[in-house]
Amino acid sequence: MKKVLTIAGSDCSGGAGIQADLKTMMAHKVYGMSAITSLTAQNTTGVYGISDVTPDFLANELECIFDDIFPDAVKIGMVSNSELIRTIADKLKKYKPKNIVLDPVMVSTSGSRLLEEEASASLINILMPLADIITPNIPEAEVLSSMKISKSEDMVEAAKVISDKLDGRTAVLVKGGHDLNTANDLLYCDERAVWFEGERINNDNTHGTGCTLSSAIACNLAMGNDMASAVENAKKYISGALKDGLNLGKGSGPLNHAFWLDINR
């Protein structure tokens, strides 16, 4: 059985963070493990509290995993301060896992900054160069490329700029999402731009979509798929999870990560 590690925050409501990651991993029939960076008190209506773990505790978590059940892929999500980012980078350099997927949780889809400047700089300069693929949304891609993205051509140019900053070693998946009124995503890998068309699904319950997509990519890479195939398969999975129409909570609810298990019985 393939093994996948998620390094991210905990969502007590189960829709995002490591809970969404582990559900995605189970649906893909891989063995999921988690190293928690922070505890969050949140639900479908908002985030009401965040408590980070200490760098020493995160280091202990990562060592316990890497020294015992070595992962075939690693997904990195919410990391809210520079010390934790440096801790993760140190362990990745020490253990050298393959198939690192980084969801750079820097800016919300509404444009709100989620990281302080120091933490953003650490994420960009220390952690991103270690990743095999990063999955920014449009606002995050704008920050990383220092350009405004208002049309599809801008997504391609921004992805090239980001890739060049990372010396072309890291694939860049720019997620179209709500910002361009399209569900199409752009993968820039090995100096090639590949579009993945997505179906616009009429469902306001999108809590945890970014976490789920990056985890599904990690699962597919762990199973031996190439980068383009991993992204394509992950897109299909998240579309199905949205289409299932799960409706929980008073706000933007979660996806049905388990729909895949029903299909693949």
Predicted features, each with a name:
Residues 86-95, 192, 223, 228-229:
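Nucleotide and nucleotide-moiety/phosphate-recognizing core
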Residues 7-13, 194-207:
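Short pre-catalytic strand/loop immediately N-terminal to key active-site residues, enriched for Gly-Thr
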Residues 52, 228-265:
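Charged C-terminal helix
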Residues 29-33, 194, 220-234:
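Phosphate-handling active-site elements
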Residues 19, 142-143, 203-227:
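Short, small-residue alpha-helix embedded
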Residues 117-193:
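Conserved phosphate/ATP/ADP-binding segment of small-molecule kinases
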Residues 2-6, 18, 26-109, 113, ...:
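Conserved N-terminal subdomain of the carbohydrate kinase-like
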